[in-house]
Amino acid sequence: MEADFAQLEFRVAAFLSQDALAMSEITSGFDVHSYTAKVISDAGQATTRQEAKEHTFAPLFGATGYGRTPSEASYYHHFIEKYEGIAAWHKKLGNEAVRFQKITNVGGRQYAFPNTERRPNGLPTNFTMIKNYPVQGFATGDVVPVVLVELENRLMPMRSTLVNSVHDSMVIDIHPYETEQVIEIINSMNMDLNQIIYDNYKVKMNVPLLLEAKIGPNWLDTQDV
């Protein structure tokens, strides 16, 4: 089984920025990748949902329309206009880095940005990293490790074993007679994820986290549970 966080960075960015639209889309199950494909296609470049995935969340990490086709670049401009809360949060982070030469994430981790200054265009130096670090730091530096530990603890009485993790995916070797039990563990963890974060960091997330599971005879040939 592969248990993979659904849109982890986007959910974390929505929480950290408290972007109302992003939070609404997450709770309603809005298909953001199909929307990205539509924006690019409407700009004149036919794009599938799969092709759009590489663009959907790229602006979260400082990517811009530079080096993209005109139709693709239109999405990057659209992202900033659509998610005003995320854009405002990015600006706030930039101001913090210029003023204090560091930024602090919600879990208390600090990222030093010495010699950060304002460029002639108004943007701070190191802006890509300034946008990126708080999201990646909380998502994969704080959330994923404690969930891995919790999953390992819940599997401990069983013969199924957590064997690997890659970024925000967890790979479980399931004993043939324990498939349903492991599925139930993942389902129960989905009910508890936000509480797990609070118990470890005293951070109360108002955006739901979600694990999506796939099962198969090997890591390549899997199907959604």
Label for each model-derived stretch:
Residues 1-225:
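Conserved catalytic core of nucleotide polymerization and phosphodiester-bond processing enzymes
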